[in-house]
Amino acid sequence: MTTAALADTSNKTVTFAGAVYNIQELGDDSYTVLKAGIPVGRIVLSFGAANGVPEGDAISEDDLTLIGEAWFEAVG
């Protein structure tokens, strides 16, 4: 069973698997994902699909992609 990711655009966060990730804009459709102030990866919207790019092993590509899907759906 996959855990749902919940985006909060007013606080610029996504809650996923019991953790809160801050979302920081880098540019058009490109964001840094931070956990406790430490960058764990990036999310990018490319051709209508969310893509997660981990920076290290703190989070998987699949989990970042789920965070990205929730974020991009919320921001429209």
What is each model feature region?
Residues 1-8, 44-76:
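Mixed-charge, Lys/Arg-enriched low-complexity segments
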Residues 10-16:
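Short acidic-hydrophobic surface loop/beta-edge motif
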Residues 20-23, 40-41:
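Short, isolated positions in well-ordered beta-strands
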Residues 28, 32-53:
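Acidic, low-complexity, intrinsically disordered interaction modules
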